[in-house]
A protein has these predicted regions:
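An edge-strand/N-cap motif at the start of beta-rich repeat modules
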Residues: 20-69, 73
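Repeated scaffold domains used in trafficking and secretory/extracellular systems
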Residues: 39-47, 80-88, 127-135, 174-181, ...
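Entry beta-strands of beta-propeller and related beta-repeat scaffolds
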Residues: 51-55, 91-95, 140-146, 185-191, ...
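Blade-level signature of beta-propeller repeat domains, shared across WD40, Kelch, NHL, RCC1
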Residues: 325-359
Length: 400
């Protein structure tokens, strides 16, 4: 095999890899940039309910039937209202609206067709008030939390009719403040984010918000960082995982102590990792989604990375380039064998199997395989006495 042929084959393989990465992220065609952030504290989210995907957009609540590939998006409620999140109780929906200075919470009894404002009173500095995020109790639909710039974390046990303050503190950056309940231990509440001097933190209450423990430098990454939305192992409730700025945080003792995997020096694993999720069927498989802004000659991009050992190590990320300066990831969910990524540009569907296959594929010389290893072409057909070209041997792409 001469040098020119080798170079041609390698270029073809690189082109094949780039094309495969582009095809991995399948846009669901929302039709408008509904995920665009409306301001510094805007965090639009999405939810999977049965076979339906509900997405909070700048123009209201939209839904898509995930069981039908060609289903159209439908506006289902809160038309023209910039939404960040919602909680559902039967036909009742409590929606978190993006706004400045008031009118944050909207209650509907008919799925969002009509609604009334139920925002609690804002005693002081109303013009500075924001409600960045909302969290629903995993088993009690009447119980939920919202975060408030001026009042801290508020708890309601009657679906938003009345509120009490759990703590007056939330982290300083409203665009990266996350609150929630532990899904298996809902008496555990967290507030993660970024402090006043940009250090990463997570505050945890183990007694339903009565007392709080702060974890900052103990996370293993002192200095400029942020702890984004935590996720929880489905069968080991002591294991939590959260993305950071170029790193991944992991705990195996219910949030008491943390370790940090720092990937800032590794281009294949570095990103602002915002959302992560354990696989429903294979709990030691974890997915994490993030993004990078435009830098020099490189455009903005969305990144997706996976781990098959519970988050202790990660395969190189798969990348989708974007025309946007910064295509921020708003949320990550799963539906069966697919991941759903909500970014500022669209909602994307990604096959879990294809993601893992592309992440674990490596290029190596055929001489490292045994003579008994069968070769397949790129269409999956077995090849006897393969000639010069690109083949799949032992589940890896090989240049021969």
């Amino acid at each position: 095999m001469n040098k020119k042929t080798i170079i041609t084959a390698l270029l073809a393989l690189v082109s094949l890899g780039a094309s495969a990465q582009a095809q991995l992220f399948r846009p669901l065609g929302l039709g408008f940039n509904g995920g665009e952030r409306q301001g510094n504290s805007s965090q639009p989210r999405m939810h999977v309910e049965g076979d339906k995907l509900y997405v909070c957009t700048s123009q209201g609540l939209y839904a898509k039937d995930l069981s039908a590939d060609n289903s159209a998006w439908q506006l289902v409620g809160f038309e023209g209202v910039p939404l960040q999140d919602y909680a559902r109780r039967g036909n009742d929906i409590l929606a978190l609206r993006y706004n400045e200075g008031g009118s944050f919470l909207l209650l509907s009894h008919d799925g969002g067709q009509t609604y009334e404002e139920v925002t609690p009173e804002i005693p002081i500095k109303k013009e500075y008030e924001r409600f960045p995020s909302m969290a629903s109790h995993p088993t009690d639909k009447n119980t939920l939390m919202v975060s408030s710039n001026c009042r801290g974390i508020l708890l309601s046990t009657d679906f938003g009719q009345t509120w009490e303050c759990l703590t007056e503190f939330i982290y300083a950056n409203p665009a990266a403040t996350f609150i929630g309940f532990h899904p298996a231990r809902p008496n555990i509440i967290y507030n993660s984010g970024e402090g006043m001097i940009f250090e990463g933190h997570i505050k945890i209450s183990y007694d339903s918000g009565q007392t709080w423990n702060d974890h900052g430098n103990s996370l293993g990454f002192p200095g400029d960082n942020c702890v984004h939305q935590p996720t929880f192992h489905p069968t080991n409730p002591d294991r939590w995982l959260a993305g950071g700025e170029g790193c991944v945080f992991l705990t195996d003792d219910n949030g008491q102590t943390w370790s940090c995997q720092n990937y800032w020096g590794d281009e294949t694993r570095s990103a602002y990792w915002y959302f992560s999720i354990f696989d429903n069927e294979h709990p030691d498989t974890v997915y994490i989604a993030g993004c990078l802004g435009r830098s020099g000659q490189n455009g903005g991009c969305i990144k997706l990375m996976c781990s098959t050992d519970g988050g202790r190590s990660w395969y190189p990320s798969q990348v989708m380039t974007s025309d946007r300066e910064f295509d921020r990831v708003n949320d990550l969910q799963q539906y069966g064998d697919r991941l759903l990524i909500y970014s500022e540009s669209d909602v994307y569907s990604v096959s879990k199997a294809e993601l893992i296959a592309q992440s674990t594929t490596a290029i190596r010389s055929v001489v490292s395989d045994t003579k008994e290893s069968p070769a397949y072409d790129l269409q999956g057909c077995k090849v006897v006495n393969p000639k010069h070209g690109i083949y799949i041997i032992n589940k890896r792409k090989v240049v021969k």
